């Protein structure tokens, strides 16, 4: 896979969130690994080497009851179902960025409505 031009990806796929904000989140969540899989309560022996391996691994984990976080923004498997995304979508760079930014924005706005300050709302938005 060619190197990711993250600034362009963020600008095209999640233009309503500052690219610097998305970069900080993705760096923390996946270290910019588009095939990253985080298994909540467990750990993979190794991370997938490509998109196909990531999809098969994630599908197996979900089918066996694991809660997993997928791709650049580490989208949780619960949110895939909630927002109508597939496991394959989670490993599509643009779709992952779009959904990650949408979840961030939704959670941020919900926290603001609940009276949280900007920084506290941002922390809630990242969850």
Model-derived regions, located:
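Export/targeting segments at the very N-terminus of extracytoplasmic proteins
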Residues: 1-60
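Solvent-exposed, polar/charged alpha-helical surfaces in well-ordered, non-transmembrane soluble domains
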Residues: 7, 19-23, 95-105, 123, ...
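Surface-exposed patches in mature extracellular/periplasmic domains of secreted proteins
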Residues: 20-24, 35-36, 70, 111-126
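Short acidic/histidine-centered micro-motifs embedded in hydrophobic/aromatic stretches
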Residues: 24-29, 74-78, 125-127
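Alpha-helical segment that forms one wall of the substrate-binding/catalytic cleft
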Residues: 50-118
